[in-house]
Amino acid sequence: METFEVTDGVYGIDTGLFGGSFTAVYLFDDDEPTLVDSGAAATVGTVLEGLRTVGVPPSDLENVVLSHIHSDHSGGAGGLLEYAPDADVYIHETTAPHLADPSGLIASSREAMGEHFESMGEQRPVPEENIVSVPETGTTIDIGSNALELVYAPGHSPDHF
């Protein structure tokens, strides 16, 4: 696991998914600590270690912004909320229901990923009260001295921000 500073107050957390350098999680260490993506369920421990490395207790996490629903980017959200139960989880409105009930997502991921599926870990549901369903335009998240503007950018995934 490697945690590195991208710019002042922004850190990358290399989750090590698939056995290599695979950075899929970024921390904005601001008044409201915010993760962009959660990583896969199998990497929750690595993400927690990354938070602690930069001095952010997991329970202080205020927001998790998921760029899209693919398991390597969103699969760890439910597991992270066991350590940050008050965090809001932002996701595109079309895929928000898959966070509360990931059974359909798990089935389609298993089919699409084949033998690699097991390396993603067991995806846990995100409590509905933590989910913030985001429309395609107009959402800005104030995190303190910075703000994150969510820009709808479908392509890699139809729900991509």
Each language-model region and where it sits:
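Conserved beta-strand hairpin/beta-sheet module of binuclear metal-dependent hydrolase folds
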Residues: E2-V54
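Divalent metal-coordination and catalytic microenvironments
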Residues: G9, F28, D37, V47, ...
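Short acidic loop-to-beta-strand element that houses the catalytic metal-binding Asp/Glu
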Residues: A24-F28, T139-T140, H160-F161
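Short, surface-exposed connector motifs at secondary-structure boundaries
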Residues: D30-T34, P57-E62, G144
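Active-site environment of divalent metal-dependent phosphoester hydrolases
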Residues: T43, I69-S74, A96-H98, S157-H160
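Active-site metal-binding motif and surrounding structural segment of the metallo-beta-lactamase
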Residues: V44-I91
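Metallo-beta-lactamase
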Residues: P97-V151
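Ligand/cofactor pocket segment of small-molecule handling proteins
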Residues: A147-F161
